[in-house]
Amino acid sequence: SASLVGSEMCIRDRLKGSADVFLYPGHVNAITGTALCESLTEEGVSGVVAGFTAKELLTALAVSLKRYQEGKPFFVNCYPRVVTAEGSKEAQRLVDELMESCDSEWRGLGVIPDSGMKLRKEWEMFDARVKYQIPEMEGRANPACRCGDVLQGKCKPSDCKVFGKVCTPKHPVGACMVSNEGACSAYFMYGV
């Protein structure tokens, strides 16, 4: 998918030197498959596909640490009960038929070319933004929030001035605190 390629390449370029291993989300790879992630090892990018339970995440982290210590780029699918090499062909077919890639703004990362998806022209009648002429909303990030730096591995959640004070799971300031899958939320809940 162009969306995955665009975002993956941009993030990889921005993270050069600051991320040793990517932890790929299982729900995305369940659709896209693992081919792109596997091919990135040829460019020196290591990664592991993980599930979402504590056991699945810990397994992915343990595999990452072990393989990283071997000193060679690697890819491992630690979520094989859901993620396959080819992904979901039917989901891919539907995405290709109905959607096209577009530039998209990522909180804390800025605009990443071809990292979003929108309905193709022939399906715009189902796009509420087009149908009801809803203007683009511009989000304003709290300048004290370091979510972008957390996402890029430049700091820990606890390094952020608003973490645990203004920004909590009940009152999130940045995307990293919004869901229980976010790095800041996990730090907050488990004291990592």
Where are the model-predicted features located?
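A conserved active-site cap/scaffold subdomain adjacent to cofactor or substrate pockets
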Residues: 18-83
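Internal helical hairpin/lid segments
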Residues: 59-149
